[in-house]
Amino acid sequence: MPGINGAGPSNFFWQWRTDGEPVTEREHDSSRSASSANSPELPPPASPAESGRQRLLRSSALSRQTREWLEATPARVQGANPPAEARQSPEAQQAERIVQELVRGGADLNNVRTMLRNVMDNNAVAFSRVERDILLQHFPNMPMTGISSDSVLANELRQRLRQTVRQQRALVQSSTPARLADSSSGSSQRSLIGRSTMLMTPGRSSSSSAAASRTSVDRHPQGLDLESARLASAARHNHSANQTNEALRRLTQEGVDMERLRTSLGRYIMSLEPLPPDLRRALESVGINPFIPEELSLVDHPVLNFSAALNRMLASRQTTTNSPELPPLASSAESGRRRLLRSPPLLSGQREWIEQNMRQGAEPQSSRLNRAVRLAVMPPQKENEDNVAYAIRLRRLNPGADVSRVVASFITDPAARQQVVDDIRAALDIAPQFSQLRTISKADAESEELGFRDAADHPDNATSCLFGEELSLSNPDQQVIGLAVNPTDKPQPYSQEVNKALTFMDMKKLAQYLADKPEHPLNRQRLDAKNISKYAFKIVP
């Protein structure tokens, strides 16, 4: 027993003292009493074994050696089991520091977790600049070789990110009533991305009654934490804007033709025309994946936010607006013929032949074959501009022109004209429905729940159309509407619980989109002139 008594205290003090010197029993008693008196932390609950030791210590039938050994035993056991923080591996501690850096940098932890998994699986990734810079400090070879799935640090980081994301979600759910989770998620259109997929899930229905659907817009639902929702929406908007601005900057530095990119993106979004391979590769190189799966609604795709930012950037570069389109520059062959005509020693037959050749070369083939239907104003068709969009533009430049005449002015094959005419008329049939739509006041649309921002009042943070440009009720060329996810009959006003989220857009652009593909851009249900009044709401001052 004396040998056991000497080993117990000696082992304990050699483990915890920093000077490496053993201490006496008196020092042990005094230090133990001082530490217990000065410690600000409460001791942990006693385990059953420790409670048994305390009862044994209170027994008077113990020898001095046995009592000393029992007093040292709990300390030795406690010293052999340090707290969880002390047992953390270096990789776990480094992963914790990485998460803290990401939080301080405003990174989207859920996106980082997903992209980190993609890197380890050799799949495509899209980090923001902040996320990439932080990760490169700890994974310097990530751009060249990726991250091995056997990396201890990467797996620790994924686990820590998963825990943090779950904690954040639990905090949000505890602060927001579950009753309002469905109706509030996705209702504020801060940007064109980040919509909750539960709004697009078939079969989800509201439990509200028919009387609730006939109530006016509730701008302040009870129990909704507006401040938290506003901060979360602003964080999503800033994160998306940072990614988009970084992509635009890199594309500009790489010399990509932004006008051509805007036109190609417009055709891709409006009619799913394939992007040119070089532009598709350029977008993928900056983290923008242009592929739109069939199961994903159009409004959920980040390429829409990029398209809106691209339109804003190019609009700010324009020095003049509504300027008439200039004719194309004369070709070198045409310039040579004109110089030849100015030379005096030409025979009359030669001069007539050159003049006739110039007239034929100056006129497009469509004009030579369709001189009878030549329009007064007919600019050339832009690159990647489809026939429907070009015909609508020609009709706007030539008021009063019949649709068939407009199409015949640039489509030489009579067999190919009818389909274009039908698509244009389908788009034009939707436009008159604007005056028949149910209305939402601008004040209600600008509420925290709906989040509309007129470009005239918010030039730096305006709401963008689903198909690109910024929206304003003062713009005479726009018909601003809010398109709901779920339909309701015409007499009923907008109800957030029944109609779900609103996506703001220009009805003219929507009509052009529906002419080629009559599908609801949010849920892919059929949408045409017959049922658009069940989904759309006109925004009025």
From Swiss-Prot:
Q: Where in the cell is it found?
A: Secreted
Region of interest (Disordered), ranges: 1-94, 168-222, 317-338
The protein's matches in CDD domains, at most eight in alphabetical order, are given as: HopAB_BID, HopAB_PID
Q: Which Cys residues form disulphide pairs?
A: none
| Record field: compositional bias (Low complexity) | 183-196
- Which Pfam family, any one of them, does this sequence belong to? AvrPtoB_bdg
Keyword S-adenosyl-L-methionine included in the entry's annotation: no
Spell out the family assignment given in the record's similarity comment. Belongs to the HopAB family.
Q: What does this protein do?
A: Effector protein that plays different roles depending on the species and plant cultivars that interact with the pathogen. Acts as a virulence determinant by enhancing the development of disease symptoms and bacterial growth. Acts as an avirulence factor by eliciting hypersensitive response (HR) and plant resistance.
Protein name in UniProt: Effector protein hopAB1
Q: What is the species listed in this Swiss-Prot or TrEMBL entry?
A: Pseudomonas savastanoi (Pseudomonas syringae pv. savastanoi)
Q: Tell me the name of the encoding gene.
A: hopAB1
